[in-house]
């Protein structure tokens, strides 16, 4: 836990004004897990009551995270899409967004065309998700996130803007996917 009775005196002596703390939550959502422990919630609430700003940074899209957002005490904006967006849940609006450039669609199509074992999930800020060439990894991931997804046959069917592209393949094919990506002249333009 973040907070324990042994550490309580230390926490209570801190000045948290203008202190921003983010936590990364991916493991919490990957499997059914219990809610944030009471002791952790107490520590977070204390931190916020003393002027601290607390929130979450996640690779998840807004619809996947908003189902659990109410269970996490936060008073700061949430980082979504692996950093491509900052969202204010209480205000219900994006504060900042960075989209993939339109030419990314051609790059994605090249990967999918060259590697039939690879799939890609495409995330949009309006909560839409598209999947191109879905595989078992895609289906397992969508089962975990419970996000409605539109399956498409080509990148021409995917609207812009795109907030995040997530390639997936079985573990034995990951080296081939990574080697292919690294060999492309556009590889360094993307994270």
Predicted regions, residues:
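Active-site phosphate-binding/coordination module
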Residues: 37-138
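Hydrophobic alpha-helical segments, especially N-terminal targeting/anchoring helices
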Residues: 3, 14, 21, 87-88
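Single conserved hydrophobic/aromatic residue that forms the stacking wall/gate
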Residues: 1-7, 11
């Amino acid at each position: 836990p973040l907070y324990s009775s042994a550490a309580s005196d230390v926490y209570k002596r801190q000045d948290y004004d203008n202190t921003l703390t983010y936590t990364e939550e991916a493991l919490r959502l990957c499997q059914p897990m219990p809610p944030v422990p009471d002791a952790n919630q107490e520590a977070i609430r204390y931190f916020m009551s003393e002027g601290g700003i607390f929130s979450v940074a996640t690779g998840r899209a807004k619809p996947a995270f908003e189902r659990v957002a109410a269970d996490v005490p936060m008073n700061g904006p949430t980082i979504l899409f692996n950093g491509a967006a900052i969202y204010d849940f209480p205000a219900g609006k994006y504060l900042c967004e960075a989209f993939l450039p339109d030419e990314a669609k051609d790059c994605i199509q090249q990967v999918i065309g060259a590697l039939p074992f690879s799939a890609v999930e495409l995330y949009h800020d309006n909560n839409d998700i598209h999947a191109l060439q879905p595989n078992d990894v895609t289906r397992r991931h969508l089962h975990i996130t419970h996000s409605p997804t539109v399956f498409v046959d080509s990148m021409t069917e995917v609207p812009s803007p795109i907030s995040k592209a997530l390639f997936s393949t079985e573990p034995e094919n990951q080296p081939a996917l990574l080697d292919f990506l690294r060999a492309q002249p556009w590889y360094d333009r993307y994270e």
